From Swiss-Prot:
Residues 20-40 are annotated as: Disordered. This is Large ribosomal subunit protein bL35. NCBIfam families: rpmI_bact. InterPro entries: Ribosomal_bL35, Ribosomal_bL35-like, Ribosomal_bL35_CS, Ribosomal_bL35_sf. It comes from the Bacteria. One of its GO terms (cellular component) is cytosolic large ribosomal subunit. Keywords: Ribonucleoprotein, Ribosomal protein. The keyword Ribonucleoprotein applies. Belongs to the bacterial ribosomal protein bL35 family.
Length: 66
């Protein structure tokens, strides 16, 4: 049976850390920023780490060769 292909959309959205955790960009910064406070916008910067079970599912189904 051939190897599973990595989903290209997931490849762009998620990164695997050296310890095996899955990082992703914070959501909610594409549009509609006018109604958010400066504090809310500032807190949306950077990346977050997924919960272990969610990260395991991402690695299993979308990033099988990572």
């Amino acid at each position: 049976m051939p190897k599973l292909k990595t989903k290209s959309g997931a490849k762009k959205r998620f990164k695997i850390t050296a310890t095996g955790k899955v990082k992703h960009a914070q959501r909610g910064k594409r549009h509609g920023m006018i109604k958010r406070t400066k504090k809310q916008i500032r807190q949306l910067r950077g990346t977050r780490v997924l919960f272990k079970t969610d990260g395991d599912n991402i690695k299993k189904y979308f990033l099988p060769n990572a």
